[in-house]
Amino acid sequence: MKFVVITGGVVSGIGKGITTASIGRILRARELEVTAVKIDPYINVDAGTMNPFQHGEVFVTEDGVETDLDLGHYERFMDVTLSGAHNITTGKIYQRVIEKERRGDYLGETVQVIPHITDEIKSWIREVGKASGADVVLVEIGGTVGDIEGMPFYEAVRQLQLEEGRENVMFVHLTYVPYLEHVHELKTKPTQHSVKELRSLGIQPDAIVCRCERPLDDGVKRKIALHTNVPREAVIDAHDVDLVYKVPLLLERQGFGDYICERLGLDADEPDYSDWLDFVTRIEEADDEIRIAVVGKYVDLPDAYISIREALVHAGAHVGVGVDVAWVDSEALEAGDSEAWEEVKDADGVLVPGGFGKRGVEGKIEAVRYARENDVPFLGICLGFQLVVVEYARSVLGLEDAHSTEFNPDTDHPVVDLLPEQRGVKRKGGTMRLGAEPVVLEEGSLLRRLYDDREIVLERHRHRYEVNPSYVRELEDHGLRFSGHSPDGRMEALELPDHPYFVGTQFHPEFKSRPGDPSPPFVGLIKAAAGQGPD
């Protein structure tokens, strides 16, 4: 088993996740089995209770763990299914070590960062690699080198190379090379200092991947190679591209895949990018473009909806159209902002994603009503699904006070209510209905057709509230069709039969969308928005 450790320097947020996922794609193109681990040095046990404005999207794995959004990149680029074990946090590591100490596993030792914390980190990485049967384990360390919270993890991977052998562990350092416009020059000094910091921790990088606004010339690459002690061919240009799915191809063209295989002694096939190139080409050569209005409360940070965005791209490539996303603030709709409403009215389709909290909810409900009344293709996900029920109960059933008890505990018509098993639950972290659950699709329904007539599909969930079963019959008597349910009778999906495309899902279909296997509800939305009919 081989390991590739990806570290970052200079600044955070320059694309370690995409770089790691792209390395995974490069190795997968050579028919190698690859898995990935994301290390987040924060003390939170998981990402589930973190503000999306700080952290971005919470990505839910098949086994129901709330993880970092980079796991979504890994799954999409590498076409693999990962578990919650693939996201390590400081909180998880300390939790494990403290549990062992309480059990007496350390036989009276003084428990310390070295060796106990570092040993646990190494053990976790090896366990994930062994369980996956991977040829190569990618390990991405979040943050930047020098961050105090990351120190135990850098020490652990240093020890990992010492124990596994240099021939089995490779370090890739992602850095930022700024371009100063006033002198027309790319500056390498931040990279030099970043690598100096990394080497002070006992880690010599084997390759430097340089994020930059424009391509690096050969002179800059040679300068970086000289000052960071890596071969010239191991200085890789990762300049800005207009589509993240081009990044593996950009790295491959510079020989990075061959360099990794040579460095680790991997016996790999010639790379095959035919499917990947076809996907990228379909995006680039799309004749038409449609516009989808995504109505949410975190739209100032599109990373909060990154799986939504990518699922729209996947579906667009499948249908053969480009997808332009208009990010619409639901609070602005609520306030009657004319520009925000113009974005909705100019769109070919509307999507209301999941979310939490009362802020902006009425704006989302108004967006649902607009799409329903004006025959605009619509997809509601999780909270978006629940708000369809609220809007329908108010507008069609005449239950003016109808609401979710999440937002109005005293409503006379709780058409959306807390899941029975959630009553009495006090802890917030990891206690929702999470992960993959079976959904039974009704025969003859639009959703069943979109899912290739499969009766049961497995989709991922993240919610505490559900459609109140007491109102289901009345809603259906007034034309709303619940076309998907759980085996024990919970409402999982809905549609309006006489609408061009009006679908809601309690589950999150975006989490399982892949470039070569787009999510069916998203494909239906894009087809309808493009005027092709949903199925």
Swiss-Prot record:
Pathway: Pyrimidine metabolism; CTP biosynthesis via de novo pathway; CTP from UDP: step 2/2. Residues 1-266 are annotated as: Amidoligase domain. It catalyses: UTP + L-glutamine + ATP + H2O = CTP + L-glutamate + ADP + phosphate + 2 H(+); L-glutamine + H2O = L-glutamate + NH4(+); UTP + NH4(+) + ATP = CTP + ADP + phosphate + 2 H(+). GO terms for biological process: 'de novo' CTP biosynthetic process; pyrimidine nucleobase biosynthetic process. UTP binds at residues 12, 187-192, 223. It is an enzyme of class 6 (ligase). ATP binds at residues 13-18, 70. The active site is at 382 (nucleophile), 508, 510. Transmembrane segments: none annotated. Its EC number is 6.3.4.2. GO terms for molecular function: ATP binding; CTP synthase activity; glutaminase activity; identical protein binding; metal ion binding. Keywords: ATP-binding, Glutamine amidotransferase, Ligase, Magnesium, Metal-binding, Nucleotide-binding, Pyrimidine biosynthesis. SUPFAM superfamilies: Class I glutamine amidotransferase-like, P-loop containing nucleoside triphosphate hydrolases. Belongs to the CTP synthase family. Catalyzes the ATP-dependent amination of UTP to CTP with either L-glutamine or ammonia as the source of nitrogen. Regulates intracellular CTP levels through interactions with the four ribonucleotide triphosphates. This is CTP synthase. It comes from Methanopyrus kandleri (strain AV19 / DSM 6324 / JCM 9639 / NBRC 100938). The gene is pyrG.
